[in-house]
UniProtKB/Swiss-Prot annotation:
EC annotation from Swiss-Prot or TrEMBL: 2.7.7.6
Keyword set, alphabetical order: DNA-directed RNA polymerase, Nucleotidyltransferase, Transcription, Transferase
Lineage per the UniProt record: Bacteria, Pseudomonadati, Pseudomonadota, Alphaproteobacteria, Rhodospirillales
Class in the EC hierarchy, top level: transferase
The protein's name in its UniProt record: DNA-directed RNA polymerase subunit alpha
Known role: DNA-dependent RNA polymerase catalyzes the transcription of DNA into RNA using the four ribonucleoside triphosphates as substrates.
Annotated catalysed reactions: RNA(n) + a ribonucleoside 5'-triphosphate = RNA(n+1) + diphosphate
Single GO MF descriptor: protein dimerization activity
One Pfam entry name: RNA_pol_L
Domain text: The N-terminal domain is essential for RNAP assembly and basal transcription, whereas the C-terminal domain is involved in interaction with transcriptional regulators and with upstream promoter elements.
Keyword Ribosomal protein: no
Family: Belongs to the RNA polymerase alpha chain family.
CDD domains: RNAP_alpha_NTD
Length: 340
C-alpha cells in the first residue's frame, strides 16, 4: 500500500447500511450507516441532507390557466376558494414525470362537490402521486376548466422565473418546488466496533413525496456528491503492490501462503487470530478492519500492529483474493523455504 493510498484505505469504512420503512409508508424511511470514523457522521449527514433537499430533480406545476380568469388575484364564480387559495393547493401536487417536459394537464369539473387531483387528465408520461389532494370546492351549477403546465427542475423556483416572454393573457406562473424530498433529519450516535466505542453511527430520516423512494433519494444524493468531488482528485489511482508483484508460479502473492505464526506478533494479537481460526496470511488479509475489531479482545493496538506487518509485505486488510484457499494449500505452503 502506498503512502497516498493510506489516506483513505486506513480509514474505517461503513459496512452496514440499514433501511427501514417507517409506519409501513413507502415515503418515509430511516437510513442508518455505520461504523464511520469519528466526525464523519456529522460531515456526511449534513452534506447528504443539503443535497437531498436542494439538488434532486423532480416535477412540479409551473403555471396554470383558468377559463375566465386573467390574474391570480381574481375570484372564480361558483368556486369557494379564490385563485390564490387554489394555487396554494396546486403547489401540493406530487408528480412523477417520465419525460423532460414541459407537459400539459387539464381539469374539467362541475359542481356541487370537491375537486381532487384524481380528476386531472394527463398523458401517460405523468403520474400523480397524491390523487386525493383537494384542489377546490364547487357550488351547485358551477363549472371549472383549468390547464396546468408541468416542468422538470430542482429546488425552489419563484413564479417570476416561470413566466416565458411570450406568455399569453391569463397565463399565471406559480412558485414551483421541484424537490421530491420533503423532509430530512439526522442524528449521530456512538458506534461500537470490537473494543472501540468512539466511532460514529449516522441515522437519517428521509421523507419524500412518493415520486422517488427514500432509499433511491439517498443513493442519488450520494452520487451527486461523488460527481462534484471528483474534480478535486488530482492524481491517478496507484496500483496496489500486491497486484503488481506476484509470484511467477502462483496466481497470488506467495506471502499469502505463510502462516500467521510467522508474523512474530504480540501474544495478544496472535491468540486473537488463533481463536478466530485464522491460519494463513491469505485468510487474514481478506478480513476487513471492522471484522477484525469485532474479534473478542482485539483492539486498535493489535489492528495497527497487524496492518504494519502486512504493509511490509505489500499486503493490506480487505483484499479480495480469487480462488482462495487453493485446494493444495498445505503442499504449496511447504514449498516456501525462506522464512519471513
Amino acid at each position: 500500500m502506498s503512502v497516498i493510498q493510506k489516506n483513505w484505505q486506513e480509514l474505517i469504512k461503513p459496512n452496514k447500511l440499514m433501511i427501514e420503512l417507517v409506519g409501513g409508508s413507502k415515503k418515509v424511511a430511516t437510513v442508518v450507516a455505520e461504523p464511520l470514523e469519528r466526525g464523519f457522521g456529522l460531515t456526511l449527514g449534513n452534506a447528504l441532507r443539503r443535497v437531498l433537499l436542494s439538488s434532486l430533480q423532480g416535477a412540479a406545476v409551473t403555471a396554470i390557466q383558468i377559463e375566465g380568469v386573467l390574474h391570480e388575484f381574481s375570484s372564480i364564480p361558483g368556486v369557494r376558494e379564490d385563485v390564490t387559495d387554489v394555487i396554494l393547493n396546486i403547489k401540493g401536487l406530487a408528480l412523477l414525470m417520465h419525460s423532460e417536459g414541459p407537459r400539459r394537464m387539464t381539469l374539467k369539473a362541475s359542481g356541487p362537490g370537491e375537486v381532487t387531483a384524481a380528476q386531472i387528465e394527463m398523458g401517460s408520461d405523468i403520474e400523480i402521486m397524491n390523487p386525493d389532494l383537494v384542489i377546490c370546492h364547487l357550488d351547485e351549477g358551477a363549472t371549472l376548466s383549468m390547464e396546468f403546465t408541468v416542468g422538470m427542475g430542482k429546488g425552489y423556483v419563484p413564479s417570476t422565473q416561470n413566466r416565458p416572454e411570450d406568455a399569453p393573457i391569463g397565463y399565471i406562473p406559480i412558485d414551483s418546488i421541484f424537490s421530491p424530498v420533503t423532509k430530512v433529519s439526522y442524528r449521530v450516535e456512538n458506534s461500537r466496533v470490537g473494543q472501540v466505542t468512539d466511532y460514529d453511527k449516522l441515522s437519517m430520516v428521509v421523507e419524500t413525496d412518493g415520486s422517488v423512494g427514500p432509499e433511491d433519494a439517498v443513493a442519488l444524493a450520494a452520487r451527486i456528491l461523488q460527481d462534484q468531488l471528483q474534480l478535486f482528485i488530482n492524481f491517478e489511482e496507484p496500483q496496489a503492490v500486491s497486484e503488481e508483484k506476484k509470484d511467477d508460479e502462483l496466481p497470488f502473492n506467495k506471502n499469502l501462503l505463510r502462516k500467521v505464526d510467522e508474523l512474530e506478533l504480540s501474544v495478544r494479537s496472535a491468540n486473537c487470530l488463533k481463536n478466530d481460526n485464522i491460519i494463513y496470511i491469505g485468510d487474514l488479509v481478506q478480513k476487513t478492519e471492522a471484522e477484525m475489531l469485532r474479534t473478542p479482545n482485539f483492539g486498535r493496538k493489535s489492528l495497527n500492529e497487524i496492518k504494519e506487518v502486512l504493509a511490509q509485505m505489500g499486503l493490506h486488510l480487505g483484499m479480495e483474493i480469487s480462488n482462495w484457499p487453493p485446494e493444495n494449500i498445505e503442499d504449496l505452503a511447504k514449498k516456501l523455504e525462506e522464512p519471513y
